[in-house]
Amino acid sequence: MLPKIAVIGEGVIGCTSALQIAKAIPNSKITIFHDKPFENSCSAGPAGLFRIDYEENTEYGRASFAWFSHLYRTTKGAETGVKLVSGHIQSDNLESLKQQQRAYGDIVYNFRFLDDRERLDIFPSPSKHCIHYTAYASEGNKYVPYLKRLLLEQKVEFQQKNVENLDTIADAGYDVIVNCAGLYGGKLAGDDDQCYPIRGVILEVDAPWHKHFNYRDFTTFTIPKENSVVIGSTKQDNRWDLEITDEDRNDILSRYIELHPGMREPKILKEWSALRPGRKHVRIESQQRKTTETGKEYTVVHHYGHGSNGFTLGWGTAIEATKLVKKALGL
């Protein structure tokens, strides 16, 4: 009998997990359950610049970087959304930049600290310290649909369904359930209260000449996409509201103009807000469970809590999640 595997969530983590499982267990039947159209998900808007927040996730990021490198070499960026981009992160806090160096300095290309002449020449109001590097960015509105096309080629099915209880999926005949529900992963797990929303707002502006990313202290940034430049952001913990306010716009634009005075009054093409899945650590864990109604035994593999690093870490963490799925099936 073919193993039946359910993946909860069709964002970048769910699709990445399903793709790796499909490749590792080609005789499996995989269904991805999602509660909303992809366009309304947290994975639809990000520019996907490679950057790691915490050193504990370095090896996950290294695996993802190798995957993006493969895509960049072999497939058109117009299809994958993956491109190579250079830029800078500024801060008055030298230790925060050294932490970035420890987290991914030996993964990305050309990582280095700028000297004073470079800082003063490039930036109108430079911070005291600045790093430069080159890395891949994976645009959510292209990269995840590309993964979905690969999944359809693997005969993976998609079903829009609001899953509120894992037992109902197990009782429907699934042997393993992979919980990639993002912000709602903890609630769906039923045993995890460590998840919290990180409210994010970005604006997409018309600035085709702007080719480099630029961060200041990880909250103010500009990142070029294919047809626009993303500027942001807000990182507001434990806020659930998604409506973009004038306060949001004015705050982002004022910080942005300080970084790039030559781009005053930018033409705004699009606004986007989402709730990032905050958690102190990414959860990658398997559990044996038994349904309440029928007593059926099944395995749930939790794979959620990536915060702002879903695109950067997703391929690497999915490797670990897939190992747990194979173990659950005795493979």
UniProtKB/Swiss-Prot annotation:
PANTHER family: D-AMINO ACID OXIDASE (PTHR11530), D-ASPARTATE OXIDASE 2 (PTHR11530:SF13). The keyword Flavoprotein applies. Its EC number is 1.4.3.1. This is D-aspartate oxidase 2. It is found in: Cytoplasm. One of its GO terms (cellular component) is cytoplasm. FAD binds at D35, K36, S43, G307. Belongs to the DAMOX/DASOX family. GO terms for molecular function: D-amino-acid oxidase activity; D-aspartate oxidase activity; D-glutamate oxidase activity; FAD binding. It comes from the Eukaryota. PROSITE patterns: DAO. Selectively catalyzes the oxidative deamination of acidic amino acids. May play a role in the egg-laying events and early development of the worm, in addition to quality control of the germ cells. It catalyses: D-aspartate + O2 + H2O = oxaloacetate + H2O2 + NH4(+); D-glutamate + O2 + H2O = H2O2 + 2-oxoglutarate + NH4(+). Signal peptide: none annotated. Keywords: Cytoplasm, FAD, Flavoprotein, Oxidoreductase. One of its GO terms (biological process) is aspartate catabolic process. Its cofactor is FAD. It is an enzyme of class 1 (oxidoreductase). Pfam families: DAO (PF01266).
